[in-house]
Design a protein with these regions (language model features):
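Positively charged
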Residues: 1-127
């Protein structure tokens, strides 16, 4: 297990455009994926992007599951890895809900965020 410290808002890497991944099998990419999963789970998050652990790559992971702050998850989602993600469609209908962010020092700080109700995202997987 390799838990990385979460980069906080204000660090330049959070705002910088991430780099496309050209070789998914590259050992640095595979290590980044493992570190993201370990860090996300350790910090009780349901998603995390590579820049949040100081890596420049266009990679994020998600796993909706019970956490310290999400206790009422009826059906946990599978772990998903997205490499070079690109949203190709989003619904016109939106929904709002409370979200937190691991890159905000106050982990218990949540705010209402409005998002599309559904999206289609094209991405590579970890394999």
């Amino acid at each position: 297990m390799s838990v990385k410290q979460t980069v906080q808002v204000g660090d330049k890497i959070i705002r910088r455009k991430a780099t496309l991944v050209h070789d998914v099998s590259n050992s640095e990419i595979q290590t980044t994926i493992r570190d993201l999963v370990d860090s996300m789970r350790h910090d009780n998050l349901v998603g995390m992007a590579a820049p949040q652990i100081g890596r420049k790559w266009r990679i994020f992971v998600s796993e909706v599951r019970k956490t310290t702050y999400r206790k009422n998850i009826a059906e946990p989602d599978l772990l998903r890895v997205f490499i070079n993600p690109r949203i190709t469609w989003k619904s016109k209908k939106s929904q709002s809900g409370y979200e937190g962010c691991g890159s905000v020092a106050a982990a218990q700080l949540f705010g209402v965020v409005k998002r599309a109700e559904s999206v289609i995202c094209n991405a590579l997987g970890k394999d």
